[in-house]
A protein has these predicted regions:
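Glycine-rich phosphate/pyrophosphate-binding loop and the adjoining helix
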Residues: 49, 53, 57-97
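Helix-loop-strand module that forms the ligand-binding subsite of alpha/beta enzymes
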Residues: 1-62
């Protein structure tokens, strides 16, 4: 997912809101596996905190197992991701599921 203005994109926030209804409704959704794959334009990794922290906390609330994270900074233009090991990291993370 892209990082927009140091936060989660609205589409992902909508998913979190809908999943939260299961929690407050008492539905047992524990034990799922999840991961974070995100990129941003800036070079500083702390820019990812606005995405990483809410997703980690949401996973903890739902009692999901965070399998891993791939956070790739410095990705602005088309093709920039190819200059990183982000795709290889994402492929390795996918193997954990």
């Amino acid at each position: 997912m892209p990082v927009y203005w140091y936060s989660i994109p609205a589409q992902i926030k909508g998913v979190i809101d809908r999943m939260f209804s299961f929690v407050v409704g008492g539905k047992n959704i524990a034990g799922k596996e999840c991961a974070i794959i995100a990129c941003c334009e800036e070079a500083e990794m702390d820019v990812m905190d606005g995405v990483r922290i809410p997703l980690e906390r949401s996973a903890a609330l739902m009692k999901w197992d965070m399998v891993g994270e791939v956070l790739v900074p410095g990705v602005l233009n088309a093709g920039d991701i190819a200059k990183t090991d982000g795709c290889a990291q994402a492929a390795a993370l996918a193997e954990k599921f």
